[in-house]
Amino acid sequence: MAEESRVPSSVSVTVAHDLLLAGHRYLDVRTPEEFSQGHACGAINVPYMNRGASGMSKNPDFLEQVSSHFGQSDNIIVGCQSGGRSIKATTDLLHAGFTGVKDIVGGYSAWAKNGLPTKA
């Protein structure tokens, strides 16, 4: 049973927006460059991957950085650009003991496409 709780739960962008309005917090795991081009209102940016000279690599300080913004029992919705990084980030957070995390299907691309509130 405990193993099942480590399987990420995913929600649509419309459900994610409703959760945000209900008090959940938005963790945007895109790069700072992507985040600066537009993000969901109120989102906190902690990159899951860093862009370096040799391409993208996992942020070794991701869990520590997330922990500086969120508690392990906080309700968090996790998004990236299209869903690939956020599902991995959500899985890592669950394995690290975060209990209220949900992945956003389609990420920021789907969020913006659905006309949900954004900020540049």
UniProtKB/Swiss-Prot annotation:
Keywords recorded for this protein, A-Z: Chloroplast, Plastid, Transferase
Principal location listed in the UniProt entry: plastid
Keyword Transferase: yes
Catalytic-site annotation from UniProt: 80
Function: Thought to act during the early stages of leaf senescence. Catalyzes the transfer of a sulfur ion from a donor to cyanide or to other thiol compounds. Substrate preference is thiosulfate > 3-mercaptopyruvate.
Domain Rhodanese: 20-120
Subunit composition and interactions: Monomer.
GO-annotated cellular components: chloroplast; cytosol; plastid
Presence of the UniProt keyword Cell cycle in the record: no
Source species, domain of life: Eukaryota
Any one GO molecular function term: thiosulfate-cyanide sulfurtransferase activity
CDD domains found in the cross-reference section: RHOD (cd00158)
Subcellular location: Plastid, Chloroplast
Listed name of the protein: Thiosulfate sulfurtransferase 16, chloroplastic
The species this protein was found in: Arabidopsis thaliana
Family matches, as InterPro entries: Rhodanese-like_dom, Rhodanese-like_dom_sf, Thiosulfate_ST/Rhodanese-like
Amino-acid positions noted as binding substrate in the UniProt annotation, renumbered to this chain: 85
SUPFAM superfamilies: Rhodanese/Cell cycle control phosphatase
This enzyme's EC code(s): 2.8.1.1
Catalytic activities: thiosulfate + hydrogen cyanide = thiocyanate + sulfite + 2 H(+)
